[in-house]
Amino acid sequence: MSYDYNSSDPIKIKLADLEARERFLLSESKTFCMYPWIHLHAYPTGEAYPCCLAEMEHPIGNMRDNSLEEIWNGSNYVQMRERMLADKPCKECTRCYEQEAQGFFSMRNSHNKHFGHHIDKVDQGVNPDFKIVYWDIRFSNLCNLKCRSCGDIFSSNWVQENK
């Protein structure tokens, strides 16, 4: 799947057209996020997470040890999805929960808004078809930039500065 960079608006869905469970997950749940059903993020170290904001102490797997499919349907990711479906908080998602508690519109809120049209992919914790819609895999930290919003994990130019 590719991204349409000329797209101005996300695909819109009408909450009234959804089943009650889908409507609850997208608009009322305090823990549900679309990303664990459609996305995977991986650092240059191989550690995989549900998104770039996930707590680094809680990877869902490591791409050096497991295939993408093994991580996607592995126990850590499956348990995380099951917790979300049960409307229970996930340790990986603490940053979004904290932002929302402070009154901010979190990435979780944004993902549900912009990727809610994928709600039909949400069934149980396992996705046997292994269809990732969007991934963000950082293969190395080789970079000739030193952006202030970055660090040595993503940019080799920051390594000397951080020693």
Please identify what each model-predicted range represents.
Residues 102-103, 149, 156-157:
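Short, non-ligating residues that shape and space the ligands of small metal-coordination modules
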Residues 117-126:
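A Trp-anchored, charged/polar loop motif used as the substrate-binding/catalytic surface
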